[in-house]
Amino acid sequence: MSPYAPENNQDPGGGLVTEGNQPQQNNFVNTNKSPTTTPPPQTSNVVSTPPATAINAAGVNNGLINGVLNNSSSSSSSSSSSSSSSPTPTSISPPLSDIEQTLNAYPTDLPELVVAACWWAESLGKLNMNIPKENIKRFRKELIFALRDRIKGHWYPDYPERGQGYRAIICEETTDRLLMDAAKKSDIVGEFRQLVKQNTTMWIDPGNVTYRHGKHYEKTLYPFNSINNHYSHHNNNNNNNNGINITNSNNTIPINTSGYHNINNHLNNSNNTIPPQQSQQHINNNNNNSNNNTTNNIILNSLHHHQTQISQQHLNNNNNQNNFSYGITSTRLTQNVVNSNSNGLNGRVSSPSLSSTAPVFSPSNSMYHHVQQQSHSPSISPPASPSKDLGNSSGNNTNVYSSNNNLFYNSNTSSSKIKLAYS
């Protein structure tokens, strides 16, 4: 009996017969040995070949398996190689290999212009291998010169967005005239629109060069780490100098944080000091004014007990003027005084005629003694007294005696006159 004869579970045609829920199995034949080896059960979708000799069937099966394995390995290797060679979305921009040499060749030009010109030149060279390299270099040079003329008067380092649309190189529906002129000067023949990338826009701004290809891909070419960005360095210097100090012989006042309070404190510390002698003089003057006010109250209350409210208001204003405190600079203020007596007149402003500059009638004033010495002069009289009470005033009616800093007043006026004055 041949070792390749069919068994109970195999039909003569080589097809697999399944019984019940038993899994399908394949018998792999080893041509070197006579017994048949059966591997562990596994599912398989491989259908045996049409009826043939056992050796041919086994050979075909081995060939198919080897072919499938070889094809799968070759397809996987080809797919991996194709995936590694296919361009990624971020590899559209060609590398700027000689950018450092170009920057050194144009030290007086802005690096933004050099980077932009190098990118367009290398893109043109990569897409058109038949263009000589010398023409590509000339194209780059002419483009740098053209960009230099374009940004003249439209370059604002403090406002990079200003003039952005004017400086941009646009190849959308039409090709930018800047590129076409540079190609013409570089002896690059042919339709230039077919030589460069379309649907590309490049923005050349102070401190930044970015291009967009299509609608979704965008890449920044400048700044980059290999070259120092002098604009960022300039901005760092400005940030370090933001704190400005004003220095004098005594101290330093920073004005970048809370300058108003510091300057105010500095001025207060220098101006609020009063010499001891001057402050003592102010205290003595205030004491003298207080004593005079007490004397004034005693005498005037006895003299004008029945006077009108006008004379009382005049007296209150007089007390305010005598008790008015001097300022830091020891100068008397010539403004209206506020009546601050305890008679319910708080916050009341005096009349302009009763201000500190107006002459005030007071018994302690030198003007009062001058009136007594020249009592026969009818031109001077107390301003608040009624005119009919002063009609018969003479030197015999009023006598003033001073002794031990006390003033006494004797009046010969009868009470009938007082009653007559207020009848």
UniProtKB/Swiss-Prot annotation:
Pfam families for the chain: BTG
One biological process term in Gene Ontology: cell fate commitment
Biased composition (Low complexity): 43-54, 257-272, 284-297, 341-351, 369-379
InterPro entries attached to this UniProt entry: Anti_prolifrtn (IPR002087), BTG (IPR033332), BTG-like_sf (IPR036054)
GO cellular component, one term: cytoplasm
Biased composition range(s): Polar residues: 19-28, 273-283, 352-367
Protein name, UniProt field: BTG family protein
Region of interest called Disordered, as start-end residue ranges on this chain: 1-54, 69-96, 257-297, 341-398
